Amino acid sequence: MTKLKKFGGKYKDETVERIARYFGFSAGLHFGTDKPDESRMKAAKKTLKEWTHGNGELFVIVDKKDTVGFVHINYRTGNTAWIEDIYVDETRRGQGIATRVIGLAEDKIKSHRGYTSICLEASPDNKAALALYHKLGYVTLGMITVRKEIYKNDKKNETELFGTDL
């Protein structure tokens, strides 16, 4: 059984580590490396503070009594809430946890009056996440963020988007 538990201090160290790994996963998609380093840990601590002092909620994901990740929900102005960040430990992926977490996050959002839609984002390189979101009824909006690295990296920037090689 998968549950969301409101983030609390007892989860701080492991959540900082997971945020750093989450940044590493994103970096791996973009830069070809996902190794946590001191600067990523520092950024993770800062991010945790921001997530717990803003307009959102941070939950740890508990599956079969094990803490296996986190989900961050942001209640922005207007009627759209955002599932900003979802992270499931690599060893627990492919077991349906993210599917259950999204459903639980949707229930949390529905409990807040006035929200009529939910958005989330994924890198075009993260095909597994995009496939999951589409399977769960999310549709791709027309806005695409593009990015240029100002320093050299060895990652080949080949992306397929909507069946078109970019």
Describe the role of every protein-language-model region.
Residues 13, 95, 127:
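Loop/helix-junction capping segments adjacent to catalytic residues or to phosphate/diphosphate-binding pockets
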Residues 88, 94-107, 131, 135:
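Conserved acetyl-CoA-binding loop-helix of GNAT-fold acetyltransferases
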Residues 120-130, 146-153:
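Conserved beta-strand-loop-alpha-helix junction that forms the acyl-donor binding cleft
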Residues 109-121:
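Conserved GNAT acetyl-CoA-binding A-motif
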Residues 97, 114-115, 138:
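Helix N-cap/coil-helix junction residues
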